[in-house]
């Protein structure tokens, strides 16, 4: 998420795009969060300070009691965590915590599509102001970010909805099939360059996350995706409790992720034959 925002910021700084002109966003999990953050229409300095300097370990605590409580909640975190994370941003824009997707669209004028997966029916869910107009924005965020163990799934209308990464990690084809001009699409695709081995020293969480990411990798749809000229491949690490904990606790780790995203944007501009500022 930090890398993606830094990429967009650097591209705008170099006049490659204008974020305020974005009309439609397709994203899953962290990509969906990036879309929401952009749609809130903060300036980059305010948004960067919020994301880098906020003590996120207080919002997403990882301790023994938290782990024990997860058994009944089906996850370490739930809607209360999402509310705590987004409340300062929504308050700053005089938006309610209960704002619906329809009302958020009226505010942002951006057509956001967030992708999740319904376990009960084994199908991908496209969450937008068109498909779920009365759904609360924060519930939609929980749905697309409900990675097993970390975030509790959302159970409504006979559906059990979790993170869409297992079926639609990079919704490029969904975006193209909607009829959007392919030359006007900017894609930011995450690629994991390292796949840590599960060993005798691995924890239960390492084992579960390792399995999830292997499953996502096996379901990779790169070969089925239409190539686009405006695509940035962002190098990311597989999520582990250690990586998550470090990013939540350490401001410098978050700064490094921003810097990594900035460098990826510059490399893209360089390869595109464009000078950067």
Q: Where in the sequence are the language-model features?
A:
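Patatin-like phospholipase
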Residues: 1-28, 33-277
